[in-house]
Structure formats: C-alpha cells, structure tokens
C-alpha cells in the first residue's frame, strides 16, 4: 500500500471515529479555537474554526499532503517544470505578476522581458484610449470598450472590472461572450459606433463564439462608419497574427500571451487589457502586486500559516473525507457578484477530472460543484437549503471591514452583521428545545409550540470558512484571486490530477460543428440518435410554422 493510500485510510478512519464532532461543544471547550484555527496574511484573515476539524485532523491532512507531494509539485510549478502533462506545457501564470527583477527561466530563457514588454505595450495603449490620444475613425475619443471573448477571456476580466468599479476612471466597459445573438444585440443597441472600441480576445482567433460575435461587431462598424474604419475601432489579444491581420486589425494593436498561460488563469496577461483600460496601468500593477504577494506567501509560509494550503486542505477534507458534493461561495459584496461564476470555472474546469496525471482512474471524488451569489441576496434565495436541507454544503463567506461608501456606513455595518450571523447560525443551529422555548416566549400555547417547533429547528454543525480583509481594492482583489488559484492547485495535487487541461470541453464543441449544417437544413440527421434527430426535427417544424 502506498503512503498516499495509507494516509487516505487514516483520514477515513479518523472521520468514522469523529462523526459526532460537535462545533458548539468544540467552541465551548476551547476558548482559543478561533485563534488556533485561523491564519492571516497581513489584513487578510482566513477563519476555518467553524469546520469540524481538530489538531489530529490537521495532522492527518498534513500527512496526505506530504504523501501526495504537494510541496514538490508546488516547486515544480514555480520552477517552470511541464506539470501540464497532457499538453506538455509549463504552468507559469505566476510569472505574469512576478517581480521583474527575479528571472523566471523556461527552457533556458528568462520569460520576464517578454512579460514586461507586453505589459508596457498594454500600458501605452490603455493610456492612449483613456486620455483620448488614440482616437476613433471619426476623430472622437472612445467612450465605450466592448470585450468580446468567452471562458477565461471573459469571466476573469468581467469579474475584476465589476469588482473594481470604484477605481474606474476610464471608458465604460462591456463584455460580450455568448454566441446567442441577444447578447451582442442588446449590447450594441445602447452604444454609439462613433465612440466604441472592440477588443477581440482569442488566443487562436478561431473560437467559434468569439469570432461569430467579432464578425457581427465588424459588420456593425463597417455599416455605420465604413469598412476603412474597422482598423481604428478594433484591437486584439491573440497570438495568431495572420488571422488578426486578415480580420483587419493592425499588428500594433495586437497583444500576445503564451501557451504556458491557461485561459482561466489569464486575466493577469494581455487578457486583462480591458481591466487596465478601466482602472489604469498603475492600479493594474497594484492588482498584479497583490497576486505576487500571495504567490510568495504560498511558497514560503508554513502550512498552518499558509492561506492557500489551509483552504485546500479543508476543501479536500470536505469533498473527499466528508463526502460533501458542493461548496457555496458567498461574497458579501455586490461588486463581487461575478466572483462565484469566475471561481466556478477556475475550480470546476481545473478539478472536474476522473483520471490521475498518470492516466489511471482516480480513487477519490474530485472537484465539487461550486456555486454562489452575493450576500445578502442569497439569504433570500437558497440559504433555506443551506440551513435546513438534507445535504450539507460548506459555505465560504468573504467580507471587507470597510466599504467604499463611508456616507453609507450603516449599510456596510448591516452587511457585516448578516455575514457573521449566517456563519454563526450554520455552526450553532437551534435545537428543538430552543425553538419551542422561543415560541412559548412569544405567547404561543404549548400545543401550538409543539406543532410548530420542529419546523423551526436548525441542525447546525454545518461548516463554513470566512475570509475577511480591510477593503476590496486592486491589491486585495489580486491576493484573493491568487489565493483561490493556489487553493485549486493544492486540491488538484491531493486528488492527484492535472488541473491545467480541460479536455472535457472538447467533445461538445466537436459535435456542435457536426450538427450546425443539420440545424441549418443543409444535411439530414441520419446516423444520429433518435433524441437528437427528434429535437432537430421539432425545431425545424417550429421554425416553419
């Protein structure tokens, strides 16, 4: 039996022995539980004390991390080893925010001069757009920028742009991703072609959704302003210079990145150009600096003080040992409304795998379902299930100590109170006796209280972690995203899978390409299953009616 299998067995045995672990009792018995079960990086604090873990649990998690080689794999990533084994690629998104004075060597070459050159080009272009020195074909300054991309070319920049809204002092930003024509139609109808710039974000310049939307945008500009205006109203983030040129975009407006940057890790690269246009190069650098600090923390801090390590170990405990199928991410910040969707891609596309990096079937459950909404909205939507449902779903709360609206401090105080109350309620719950006593205190009869009390019981003992930081600024957002990137890495190492490929998205794309001529009526559906053929026929009938 391998060291990994032994460590896994020990954790499972420990879970069987501690299934009656009670968080209420744990806090009652240990007044120092919070200080012992939390870790911090400057003002950013991770509290995992409301999870059913003990010192013994953490020691056993350390053993499986050692057996899985988490530390060794971490060093391989930072050292540019080709840990993306299915694509034979290094994984170097950390180089995008690395201090440029420290070389990052890949195949004998320092990648940092290229990284800095792209950042400098982005800065020059974004400042030109922001200041109005780079103008539209009409001679006017750009007032609106539309980023056209999908997946990592959309989710990250869209999330960060909204999150950093208080720092916007550039043109308005818009994001179009879905191939559904409604998305680009509804975006364009509110814009003036005279003052609209488009950024086409596609590494290969072949992504079908992106290029379909890009073609529509080009036609819109050509129709309104003439074909010669296209070059002035478009920029691209791509490595396919020939395809970009054929589209009508000059090479001076093309910003590249590298095959060692995965899409869902790419907002630090030229994919982040719309973020830089919104908040400016200086704030974008602060964003990178925050991530770089978390990188150093992840690499240098001891396990118990290491935020990504602890978040990953707790995540593994919940998913594999406790068997919880999902986790809810609840940022108590309306400007982080897109963060759950961003983390959904980061986590589920990375760790939704069933084969180890050695090509064998996994022996443990892998990535959980990740979902969420901002608080307090979620409290009035799905918290019912979190508190009283039959499935236990760990919750990850995050909250800033200070908001951006000092004149509305009472709003933020209420937001904080709700966040902390939900965390406390999940942990404490309410017993049948407490529920009945509360009803009796309200003047209800004994019989009525007996009837209603079971409905007002909260089982409690439901795990949550809370992340607190002073304020959501570019530096803090950089730290927060890097924290979750490295958490996903830790869990992938514990699952023994490759977090950096995404073959699961390919089959559907291949079949969509085959089905398009069938949907268009250019081919029949012969050879397809009866369900797909029947659905095509029904759609055709509805179109003809």
UniProtKB/Swiss-Prot annotation:
Q: Cellular location of this protein?
A: Cytoplasm
Reaction(s) this enzyme catalyzes, per UniProt: alpha-D-glucose 6-phosphate = beta-D-fructose 6-phosphate
**One GO MF term:** glucose-6-phosphate isomerase activity
- Which Gene Ontology biological process is one annotated for this entry? gluconeogenesis
Q: Where is the active site?
A: 349, 380, 509
Enzyme Commission code = 5.3.1.9
What cystine linkages occur within this chain?
none
Q: Which CDD domains match?
A: SIS_PGI_1, SIS_PGI_2
Keywords assigned: Cytoplasm, Gluconeogenesis, Glycolysis, Isomerase
Pathway it works in: Carbohydrate biosynthesis; gluconeogenesis; Carbohydrate degradation; glycolysis; D-glyceraldehyde 3-phosphate and glycerone phosphate from D-glucose: step 2/4
| Pfam families linked | PGI
The UniProt entry, under InterPro entries, shows: G6P_Isomerase (IPR001672), G6P_Isomerase_C (IPR023096), Phosphoglucose_isomerase_CS (IPR018189), SIS_dom_sf (IPR046348), SIS_PGI_1 (IPR035476), SIS_PGI_2 (IPR035482)
Briefly, what is this protein's role? Catalyzes the reversible isomerization of glucose-6-phosphate to fructose-6-phosphate.
List the NCBIfam families: PRK00179.1
Instruction: Cite the HAMAP family for this sequence.
Output: G6P_isomerase
> PANTHER family from the xrefs?
GLUCOSE-6-PHOSPHATE ISOMERASE
Concerning its family, UniProt says: Belongs to the GPI family.
- What protein name applies here? Glucose-6-phosphate isomerase
Look up and give the organism this protein is from: Chelativorans sp. (strain BNC1)
Gene that encodes the chain: pgi
């Amino acid at each position: 039996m391998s060291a990994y299998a032994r460590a896994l067995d020990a954790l499972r045995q420990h879970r069987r022995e501690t299934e009656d672990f009670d968080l209420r009792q744990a806090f009652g018995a240990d007044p120092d539980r919070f200080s012992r079960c939390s870790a911090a990086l400057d003002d950013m604090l991770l509290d995992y004390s409301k999870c059913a873990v003990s010192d013994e649990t953490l020691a056993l998690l350390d053993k499986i991390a050692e057996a899985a080689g988490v530390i060794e794999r971490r060093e391989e990533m930072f050292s540019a080893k080709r840990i993306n084994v299915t694509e034979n690629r290094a994984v170097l998104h950390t180089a995008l925010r690395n201090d440029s004075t420290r070389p990052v060597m890949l195949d004998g070459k320092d990648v940092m001069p290229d990284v800095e050159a792209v950042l400098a080009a982005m800065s020059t272009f974004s400042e030109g757009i922001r200041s109005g020195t780079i103008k539209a074909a009409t001679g006017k300054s750009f007032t609106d920028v539309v980023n056209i991309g999908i997946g990592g070319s959309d989710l990250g920049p869209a999330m960060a742009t909204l999150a950093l809204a208080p720092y916007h002092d550039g043109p308005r930003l818009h994001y179009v991703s879905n191939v559904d024509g409604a998305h680009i139609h509804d975006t364009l109808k509110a814009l003036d072609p005279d003052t609209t710039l488009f950024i086409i974000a596609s590494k290969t310049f072949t992504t079908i959704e992106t290029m379909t939307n890009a073609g529509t945008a080009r036609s819109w500009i050509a129709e309104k302003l003439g074909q010669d205006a296209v070059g002035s109203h478009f920029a691209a983030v791509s490595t396919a210079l020939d395809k970009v040129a054929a589209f009508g975009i000059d090479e001076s407006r093309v910003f590249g990145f590298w095959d060692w940057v995965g899409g869902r890790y790419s907002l630090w690269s030229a994919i982040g150009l719309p973020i830089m246009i919104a908040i400016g190069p200086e704030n974008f650098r602060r964003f990178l600096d925050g991530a770089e600090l978390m990188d150093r923390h992840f690499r240098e801090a001891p396990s118990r003080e290491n935020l990504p390590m602890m978040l990953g170990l707790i995540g593994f405990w919940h998913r594999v040992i406790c068997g919880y199928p999902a986790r809810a991410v609840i940022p108590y910040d309306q400007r982080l409304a897109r963060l759950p969707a961003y983390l959904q891609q980061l986590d589920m596309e990375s760790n939704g795998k069933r084969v180890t990096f050695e090509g064998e079937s996994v022996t443990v459950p892998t990535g959980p379902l990740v979902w969420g909404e901002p608080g307090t909205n979620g409290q009035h939507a799905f918290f019912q299930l979190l508190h009283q449902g039959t499935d236990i779903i760990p919750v990850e709360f995050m909250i800033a100590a200070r908001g951006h609206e000092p004149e509305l401090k009472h709003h933020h105080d209420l937001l904080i109170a709700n966040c902390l109350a939900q965390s406390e309620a999940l942990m404490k719950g309410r017993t049948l006796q407490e529920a009945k006593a509360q009803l009796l205190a309200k003047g209800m009869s004994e019989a009525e209280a007996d009837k209603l009390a079971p409905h007002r019981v909260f089982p409690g003992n439901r795990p949550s972690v809370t992340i607190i930081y002073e304020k959501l600024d570019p530096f803090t957002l950089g730290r927060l995203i890097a924290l979750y990137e490295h958490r996903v890495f830790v869990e992938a190492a514990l699952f023994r899978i490759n977090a950096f490929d995404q073959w699961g998205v390919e089959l559907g794309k291949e079949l969509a390409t085959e089905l398009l001529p069938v949907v268009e009526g250019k081919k029949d559906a012969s050879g397809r299953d009866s369900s797909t053929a029947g659905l095509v026929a029904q759609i055709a009938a509805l179109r003809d009616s």
